[in-house]
């Protein structure tokens, strides 16, 4: 009985969250799935078509932005930090929460990416098209298209597809003008 009540409340919350929150995003494509609770400021996030954010995803620091391309998914418990603290002479560390002199930027996740559960995307992270980030990885830099990365810091451990498979995959998902070429 208690379990049924829990699922009932969860389903009501989820449907409310999915129908009311998308309008608050900087940009929100169609067929976007938001599985709350999410700890984000939607005005700092752009979501492409057919994207998914799983529960307990959080974005720390106001001022930075997150762009998520179409067909991408962010797993449960991911943390996105689009800022970098800059040490300031004369400012004690305990006041760093004031974010004086912080650098912020946009973290970009290209199309068709999968960010594994519990991963961290830090300042200067940029995820190339089709990349897969293993669970609990810490990304601190550019990840090339169709790379599979894992670890802390995230390192390339494989490629998602062969070049021929990438070209076939691109032909299925994208119109000719959006496809990657063999050289890319």
Where are the regions that the model predicts?
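Terminal amphipathic alpha-helical/low-complexity segments used for targeting or macromolecular assembly
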Residues: 1-24, 29-30, 71, 78, ...
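Conserved short histidine dyad/triad with adjacent acidic residue
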Residues: 34
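Flexible, glycine/small-residue-enriched loop-and-beta-strand segment within the central core
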Residues: 38-47, 52-126, 152, 160-161
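A generic "structured core" feature
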Residues: 40-41, 79, 132, 138, ...
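Glycine-centered loop/turn positions within well-structured domains
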Residues: 66, 137, 145-147, 155
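Short amphipathic alpha-helical surface patches that serve as generic macromolecular interface elements
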Residues: 114-116, 130-136
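Short beta-to-alpha loop/turn elements within the nucleotide-binding domains of ABC transporters
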Residues: 125, 136-137, 143, 152
């Amino acid at each position: 009985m208690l379990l049924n009540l829990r699922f009932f409340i969860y389903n009501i919350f989820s449907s409310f969250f999915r129908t009311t929150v998308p309008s608050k995003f900087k940009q929100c494509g169609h067929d976007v799935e938001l599985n709350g609770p999410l700890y984000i400021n939607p005005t700092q996030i752009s979501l492409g078509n057919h994207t998914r954010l799983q529960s307990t995803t959080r974005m720390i620091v106001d001022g930075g932005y997150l762009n998520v391309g179409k067909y991408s998914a962010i797993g449960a418990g991911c943390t996105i930090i689009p800022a970098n603290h800059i040490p300031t002479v004369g400012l004690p560390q305990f006041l760093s929460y004031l974010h004086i002199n912080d650098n912020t930027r946009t973290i970009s996740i290209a199309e068709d990416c999968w960010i594994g559960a519990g991963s961290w995307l830090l300042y200067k992270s940029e995820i190339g098209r089709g990349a897969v980030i293993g669970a609990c990885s810490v990304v601190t830099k550019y990840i090339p298209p169709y790379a599979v990365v894992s670890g802390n810091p995230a390192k390339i451990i494989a490629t998602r597809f062969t070049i021929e498979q990438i070209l076939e995959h691109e032909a299925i998902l994208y119109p000719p003008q959006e496809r990657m070429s063999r050289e890319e």
